[in-house]
From Swiss-Prot:
Pfam family, one: SUR7
Compositional bias of kind Basic and acidic residues: 234-252
Ranges of biased composition (kind: Low complexity): 657-671
UniProt keyword Membrane, yes or no: yes
Compositional bias annotation for Polar residues: 414-424, 593-603, 615-637
Transmembrane segments: 9-29, 91-111, 124-144, 153-173
Membrane topology: Multi-pass membrane protein
Name under which the protein is recorded: pH-response regulator protein palI/prr-5
Gene designation: prr-5
Source organism, top-level taxon: Eukaryota
Family: Belongs to the palI/RIM9 family.
Region annotated Disordered, chain positions: 226-491, 507-560, 573-700
UniProt feature, compositional bias: Gly residues: 320-378
């Protein structure tokens, strides 16, 4: 293995070999003379370190020569006198000494190949000193040879010169090795003393910026196992690692919306109207997702029909004279509110029971100058439905549960006893009243608040509810679902108007309280009569009692009638602010002999499931979009068509005309044949009764 001391060893080995040859010269090896010359009469003469040789023989091996034995001729050939040459001949002994020192130096060079001596400046210093001494001895040998044998030097003396030169080079190599080591150590020392060069400052800065490692508590030590191979090691028993936690403590979803960011319209659409009133199941065919606040709690429920609470836009004549007190939507069993012209309190509908509960009888006559309210329909009326046409669009919220829905027959404690009632006309069928619609008021139509598309129920035609009512008709009692018709839908305008939502595969509310046979669970005494049969029977009994057209006069002042019929034909196609009053049309009473044919459809015991208008027996249309558009809805002052033969004032008819319930509008005159625009679909027939108030023609 090559080391820095390898060249030194090679040089020393060569020098040692040369010195060895010079030492074993003549007389040991006669062929290696240090000096030789030829003398006449004597022959060849050669000299070595330990003697000389002549042609006749060699001297014994000894240190120094006896020059007196030579003739004067031999001594005269040398430059130094004979006595001096005899003294110098004894100094030839330095040749073996030089060879020995060279050998020692060679051994030291071999040792310098090891790591420890080679990295020791002191050892290299010793090697250098030995090399220097060796050089001096070799040089002395050469000088002795020159002084003693000049001018007859032989090649033996020259190899001593070569050995001296090699030893000199070995001294230089040793010096270089030591100098290199010393410089290396000096550099390390300087680097160690300089903090910037050694990186101490860098590591100090790193230590200052390094994160503090988490120090764990004292850990229990593991007992050392003693035995043949037992013994404690110096390695750490526990190692602590720090793991970065990437998980966030934030648990609030990024998509959550706090209640502060909700607008009033958003609150209305996101909140679910109460599906239950006093434990009553919901009758709404569709549901709205429940809104939640930023903590995941459900928002408080809104009013019964998902109408926003706040300042409302009251329509004209909402509480004035001639108007009707505010009531609910067109629902069943309505009663008037606290306006002028109210009725008995709200308590659902029943048979002919007391006015406090059930749908029987009329309330006390209106107080003050209030006009007739709308007929008690199938749902809560818009706010401000007070004897005159409501000039606001229909609410955009889905058809909610109709308050005040009870059963026909004797008055029973109903689970809907505390539900709000919808307003009814002044002269309505038994059980229809004019309740007040307390609580939140309905505001103007806002397209952004519409949650579900639905078909609009046309408002009642004017001049139908003004007539005197006929005698009360006892309704037939037949067991059926409590006010639920075909496919789990009530026979009301609000439920039929929601057919578009049913076409979108919306199923009925599963919370309806029906048993396995489809019958109501309200009580054993609850009976049900299909609404349309009740209307037909009511009209049969009440129509003959109507006064002749000539004997019927206006029951209210002309100005009041005009006020009630200014926008009576408004079908939410024009904003109420831009509706123009229409001229009074021909105020003709309906024929006396008109009677309603019996109902041809029965909706009893139909399984509750999603229904489609294509399953209607009398409808030729499968979608609301297939119905034609009334070509005269934009005509402002077009007269109404004459009455159709065989059609009674409520919109029913004989012959090929499909019967339907009359469209009722408070404060309007008797109906004519122009209200047959919905005869093509019996599901959109609206309730109505004859009145004594003339109607005015207007746009539809």
């Amino acid at each position: 293995m090559l080391r820095p001391a390898t060249p030194l060893a090679v040089l020393l080995f060569a020098a040692f070999g040369l010195l060895t040859l010079a030492t074993i010269s003549t007389p040991i090896i006669k062929q290696i003379p240090l000096s030789s010359f030829e003398i006449k009469d004597v022959g060849d003469l050669s000299f070595g370190v330990f003697g000389y040789c002549t042609s006749s023989g060699c001297s014994p091996i000894e240190i120094g020569y006896d020059t007196s034995a030579f003739s004067d001729k031999i001594n005269s050939d040398f430059d130094i006198p004979r006595a001096t040459r005899s003294t110098l001949s004894s100094i030839l002994i330095v040749h073996p000494v030089a060879a020995l020192i060279t050998l020692i130096n060679f051994v030291l060079a071999i040792v310098a190949h090891f790591h420890s001596p080679s990295h020791s400046a002191r050892y290299l210093l010793i090697l250098f000193i030995v090399s220097f001494v060796d050089f001096i001895v070799c040089l002395l040998c050469f000088l002795v040879d020159v002084l003693l044998f000049i001018p007859h030097l032989s090649w033996g003396s020259y190899i001593v010169v070569a050995a001296t030169i090699l030893v000199a080079f070995c001294g230089l190599v040793t010096c270089a090795m030591r100098r290199t080591l010393v410089n290396r150590k000096a550099n390390r020392k300087r680097i160690a003393e300089n903090a910037e060069m050694s990186g101490e400052n860098y590591y100090n800065r790193q230590a200052q910026t390094a994160p503090v490692t988490q120090v764990t508590g004292p850990q229990p030590t593991v007992p050392m196992i003693s035995g043949a191979n037992g013994g404690g090691d110096k390695l750490p028993e526990f190692t602590t690692f720090e793991k970065k936690d990437d998980r966030s403590e934030e648990r609030i979803p990024l998509t959550s919306v706090s209640p502060i960011e909700r607008s009033p319209a958003t609150l209305v659409n996101d909140s679910t109207p109460p599906n239950f009133m006093d434990g009553a199941p919901s009758r709404s065919p569709s549901t709205t997702p429940v809104g939640r606040d930023q903590y995941g709690n459900p928002l408080p429920p809104q009013d019964g029909y998902a109408m926003r609470v706040g300042p409302q836009n009251e329509r004209l004549n909402s509480r004035g004279r001639g108007g009707m007190p505010p009531g609910g939507y067109r629902g069943r069993g309505g009663f008037p509110g606290p306006g002028r012209g109210g009725g008995p309190p709200q308590n659902g509908r029943g048979g002919y029971g007391p006015p406090g509960r059930g749908r029987g009888g009329y309330g006390p006559p209106p107080r003050g100058y209030g006009g007739p309210g709308p007929r008690g329909g199938r749902g809560p009326p818009p706010q401000g439905y007070q004897g005159g046409p409501d000039r606001r669009p229909s609410p955009g919220a889905p058809y909610g549960p109709g308050p005040g829905v009870g059963t026909y027959g004797p008055s029973q404690p109903s689970p809907y006893a505390n539900r709000q009632q919808s307003p009814g006309p002044q002269f309505a069928a038994p059980g229809y009243g004019n309740p007040e619609q307390p609580g939140p008021q309905y505001s103007a139509y806002n397209p952004r608040r519409v949650s579900l598309p639905r078909a609009e129920s046309p408002p009642p035609l004017p001049g139908i509810d003004d007539g005197m009512p006929g005698p009360a008709v006892e309704l037939d009692a037949s067991p059926a679902n409590r006010g639920v018709g075909q496919y789990g839908i009530r026979d009301s305008d609000s439920d039929v108007a929601g057919m578009l939502a049913m076409q979108q595969a919306r199923v009925p509310d599963p919370d309806r309280g029906n048993d396995a046979n489809g019958h109501s669970q309200e009580g054993p005494n609850d009976v049900y009569v299909p609404p349309r049969q009740a209307w037909n029977q009511g009209f049969v009994g009440s129509t003959p009692g109507l006064a002749p057209p000539t004997a019927r006069g206006p029951t209210r002042p002309i100005s009041e009638a005009v006020t009630a019929t200014v926008a009576s034909d408004y079908y939410e196609d024009v904003d109420p602010r831009f509706a123009e009053p229409s001229a009074a049309a021909d105020k003709r009473p309906p024929p006396i002999s008109m009677q309603s044919p019996p109902a041809s459809n029965s909706y009893d015991d139909i399984p509750n499931r999603a229904r489609s208008p294509a399953e209607s027996e009398n409808s030729n249309f499968t979608s609301i979009s297939q119905r034609g558009i009334n070509p005269r809805w934009n005509s402002a002052n077009a007269p109404m068509p004459p009455p159709v033969a065989g059609v009674y004032a409520g919109g029913g008819g004989g012959g090929n005309v499909v019967p339907r319930r009359p469209v009722n509008r408070p404060g309007a005159g008797p109906a004519d044949g122009s209200d047959l625009f919905l005869n093509s679909n019996p599901d959109f027939q609206l309730p109505g009764r004859g009145g004594n108030m003339p109607r005015a023609a207007g746009p539809r």
